[in-house]
UniProtKB/Swiss-Prot annotation:
The keyword Lipoprotein applies. The lineage of its organism: Viruses, Riboviria, Orthornavirae, Negarnaviricota, Polyploviricotina. GO terms for molecular function: host cell surface receptor binding. It comes from Influenza A virus (strain A/Equine/Kentucky/2/1986 H3N8). It is a single-pass type I membrane protein. GO terms for cellular component: host cell plasma membrane; membrane; viral envelope; virion membrane. HAMAP family: INFV_HEMA. Keywords: Clathrin- and caveolin-independent endocytosis of virus by host, Clathrin-mediated endocytosis of virus by host, Disulfide bond, Fusion of virus membrane with host endosomal membrane, Fusion of virus membrane with host membrane, Glycoprotein, Hemagglutinin, Host cell membrane, Host membrane, Host-virus interaction, Lipoprotein, Membrane, Palmitate, Signal, Transmembrane, Transmembrane helix, Viral attachment to host cell, Viral envelope protein, Viral penetration into host cytoplasm, Virion, Virus endocytosis by host, Virus entry into host cell. This is Hemagglutinin. Gene3D superfamilies: 3.90.20.10, 3.90.209.20.
Length: 565
């Protein structure tokens, strides 16, 4: 019986020795911010990894209207840019206008003599980039012909008229002499001359207007020469006309000379447009124009340019995000998110960063949770938090700087005879978009990987900094926590946080407590052995006592045992 009592007391003494139950130790855990529901981003190593915060990088919608600030936006209304340049009567309001962006509407149409421009896209681009319809008339001398031809297909008011920037020349009497006119460029800028040739609908119309059965127009400079012969024949009727005019253009450099030679069918220039170099453009759009501010315009409307990428439209003007095919790309602006697990008592509540993050941290991304003689508490670490934020801040701006186009992406137009060129251009544009889409995804994945790595590194730096401060005064419990072997009140915890902790002050106390605790602290394996040994001895003693009682009772006659065979 004495042995049993001794073993029971020994077992009770072993389990009563809880090193953390007194006031001479403390527990300190390091952790990081977490949220209940994070955002999934893509990195180089993971297609989906959860972070506490992320920023969308792809602008996918427009504001639905075109802002007239920060650019001069000119609404073409029912006129195309070329009609306004030629002087179509219903476009007279646009003479001498200036613009950064000329908006052509889908409802725009010509309202004069039907024409075509063999190199329409190039002329439209040249005029659009010039940003002005500034026109200067010149004194061309056309001897022996009738000037200012008119047509019922081109009404100015109720009267027959013609394009105001062109001079339709026809016979005078019964003659149309050969014309040979020169015009030098003595200015220091390029001059754009617009001219044309008339294609009559029949031979009868040809001789009626020009006498000769076939005319010819040759326009030359020192650098180029164009000779055009009319194609006589009936065409589909447009505004009462089956004839056509083909419009051509010639640029005369400073010091060069314009020479026009013709014996019929000439639609002559009246002067020149002054070409300017700039970043003006033209865009087809039906979006309304309104008073607002935006640095990026698409046919769908203006879009903000605070994101590096957009998938609203390939055609843009201004300082615009790069067009890509992806609908979404998210840039990590927070750390890896490990939602906090269910609390498992007081020690589970202060589990360290290795196990999970901490929700509800409001004073930093990284911090401390502790338990000491004064209770429990939590505090953020501003220095490590600021170090991480400083490295993440500016990531978005750097991505925008790398990708935003500082120029406009104009529309591409080609005639039917240039179909192969159009196919090639489309292939090149599609390849560029595919390449940029891939580059964008790769760039964001790299940045996300860097963000997660650097935030993890800041957590590790804080842990190592704390370990170096505590030295032998504490023991790494694993999971991001330390057991401090001396009394550490809130002021002591504060000194660890701000880096002023002096381990020499607590060294003797910590060593003494460590030795005392270690002297009586039994490992879980030894405790198990003692339990099994005490259990076995107790069972043996109980059996001995029970057997002795039975034998004693048998001797006294109180118990009789019959054995039958």
């Amino acid at each position: 019986m004495k042995t049993t009592i001794i073993l029971i007391l020994l077992t009770h003494w072993v389990y009563s020795q809880n090193p953390t139950s007194g006031n001479n130790t403390a527990t300190l855990c390091l952790g990081h911010h977490a949220v209940a529901n994070g955002t999934l981003v893509k990195t180089i190593t993971d297609d989906q990894i959860e972070v506490t915060n992320a920023t969308e990088l792809v602008q996918s919608i427009s504001i639905g209207k075109i802002c007239n600030n920060s650019y001069r936006v000119l609404d073409g209304r029912n006129c195309t840019l070329i009609d306004a340049m030629l002087g179509d009567p219903h476009c007279d309001v646009f003479q001498y206008e200036n613009w950064d962006l000329f908006i052509e509407r889908s409802s725009a149409s010509s309202n004069c003599y039907p024409y075509d421009i063999p190199d329409y896209a190039s002329l439209r681009s040249i005029v659009a980039s010039s940003g002005t319809l500034e026109f200067t008339a010149e004194g061309f001398t056309w001897t022996g012909v009738t000037q200012n031809g008119r047509s019922g297909a081109c009404k100015r008011g109720s009267a027959d008229s013609f394009f105001s920037r062109l001079n339709w020349l026809t016979k005078s009497g019964n003659s149309y002499p050969t014309l040979n006119v020169t015009m030098p460029n003595n200015n220091n800028f390029d001059k754009l001359y617009i001219w044309g040739i008339h294609h009559p609908s029949s031979n009868n119309e040809q001789t009626k207007l020009y006498i000769q059965e076939s005319g010819r127009v040759t326009v030359s400079t020192k650098r180029s020469q164009q000779t055009i012969i009319p194609n006589i024949g009936s065409r589909p009727w447009v505004r009462g006309q089956s004839g056509r005019i083909s419009i051509y253009w010639t640029i005369v450099k400073p010091g060069d000379i314009l020479i026009i030679n013709s014996n019929g069918n000439l639609v002559a220039p009246r002067g020149y447009f002054k070409l300017r170099t700039g970043k003006s453009s033209v865009m087809r759009s039906d979006a309304p124009i309104d008073t607002c501010v935006s640095e990026c315009i698409t046919p769908n409307g203006s879009i903000p340019n605070d994101k590096p990428f957009q998938n609203v439209n390939k055609v843009t003007y201004g300082k615009c995000p790069k067009y890509i095919r992806q609908n979404t790309l998210k840039l990590a602006t927070g750390m890896r998110n490990v939602p906090e697990k269910q609390i498992r008592g007081i020690f589970g509540a202060i589990a360290g960063f290795i196990e999970n993050g901490w929700e509800g941290m409001v004073d930093g991304w990284y911090g401390f949770r502790y338990q000491n003689s004064e209770g429990t508490g939590q505090a953020g670490d501003l220095k490590s938090t600021q170090a991480a934020i400083d490295q993440i801040n500016g990531k978005l701006n750097r991505v925008i700087e790398r990708t935003n186009e500082k120029f406009h992406q104009i529309e591409k137009e080609f005639s039917e005879v240039e179909g192969r060129i159009q196919d090639l251009e489309k292939y090149v544009e599609d390849t560029k978009i595919d390449l940029w889409s891939y580059n964008a995804e790769l760039l964001v994945a790299l940045e996300n990987q860097h963000t997660i790595d650097l935030t993890d590194a800041e957590m590790n730096k804080l842990f190592e900094k704390t370990r170096r401060q505590l030295r032998e005064n504490a023991e790494d419990m694993g999971g991001g926590c330390f057991k401090i072997y001396h009394k550490c009140d809130n002021a002591c915890i504060g000194s660890i946080r701000n880096g002023t902790y002096d381990h020499y002050i607590y060294r003797d106390e910590a060593l003494n407590n460590r030795f005392q605790i270690k002297g009586v602290e039994l490992k879980s394996g030894y405790k198990d052995w003692i339990l099994w040994i005490s259990f076995a001895i107790s069972c043996f003693l109980i059996c001995v006592v029970l057997l002795g009682f039975i034998m004693w009772a048998c001797q006294k006659g109180n118990i009789r045992c019959n054995i039958c065979i």
